[in-house]
Amino acid sequence: LSDRFGRRPVLIISIAGATADYLLMAAAPSLLWLYIGRIFAGITGANMAVATAYVSDITPAHERAKRFGLLGAVFGIGFIAGPVIGGVLGEWNLHAPFFAAAFMNGINLIMTAVLLKESKHSNKMTEKVQEQSILKKLSYLITQPNMAPLLGIFLIITLVSQVPATLWVIYGQDRYGWSIFIAGVSLASYGICHSIAQAFAIAPMVKRFGEKNTLLCGIACDAIGLLLLSIAVEEWVPFALLPLFALGGVAVPALQAMMSRGISDERQGELQGLLSSFNSLGAIIGPVLVTSLYFMTQASAPGMVWALAAILYVITLPLLLKYRLNKYSGVP
């Protein structure tokens, strides 16, 4: 939709939907209305995909990894601050976190409507592309040179990322006896380190090593961190591994930049929408698989899930070897 009608109107509709959703949840008289609010939010929830496409529109190809990293860093900060603010407000009033979220989305909506200009590449989708079905558009993306292996890598990273997202606190409490406070500090530290790496490490790494090698470095760091965590028995080790996991966070911005190079300007929204769908799919499937495997192996091999996640990264190596820069890059 954003490729056809422009980023700005789709962003406005998406943010307006989020605002309405939180207002509805704040005033919900029953659980049914909470579900209705969540369904409505799901229908209009495209802001991250469209925002990423917008960044791709206004950024030269050789700087996209840096901008995607900054976008990820900002998202990470929100991921850390949001639960803290919600927890504090929830102690005062159970409805307050939802009203606060609606208020912040409302401010975001006003700023988007007043300050955000349409990106230069929006509305460039040709009539032929507009008439294509969704399946045909997806087929086009997947069959582009390099895109299939890069999408495979993205899906693997998405699935692997569900291991710490799902198990970090549970594993810390089971394996190391973390208190709720220590678990919270460790989770916040994990997010802060990731945000710092994405904000400040991605640009110099891409400049020095290139996007492909930066992606490889990020995967290697994350895999090593996962392997070491799988055998760690001391409670301080996860904290010591945070820099490795943080460097692992540079992989996704570099990968996004590589994929955006291989797609024409008129298809950037489709690409980011597909990646957003992969993220959603991973968030649905990942936790179920991760928790099931963890509780099956917890007694005999508590660190097996982390080791298997690291081993899963091995699949990315032959996929990455197939990558070659294609005609849309414009940059050697």
Language-model-detected regions and their locations in the chain:
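Conserved MFS/SLC helix-loop-helix module at the cytosolic interface between two early adjacent transmembrane helices
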Residues: 1-29
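Multi-pass alpha-helical transporter architecture, strongest
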Residues: 109-115, 307-332
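A membrane-interface helix-boundary motif in multi-pass transporters
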Residues: 90-103, 292-313
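Cytoplasmic helix-loop-helix junction between adjacent transmembrane helices
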Residues: 37-76
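Short amphipathic helix-loop junctions that connect adjacent transmembrane helices
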Residues: 166-183
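Helix-to-loop junctions at the C-terminal end of transmembrane segments
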Residues: 1-6, 197-211, 294
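C-terminal transmembrane helical hairpin of 12-TM major facilitator-type secondary transporters
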Residues: 212-255
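Juxtamembrane intracellular "pre-TM" segments in multi-pass secondary transporters
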Residues: 117-153, 175
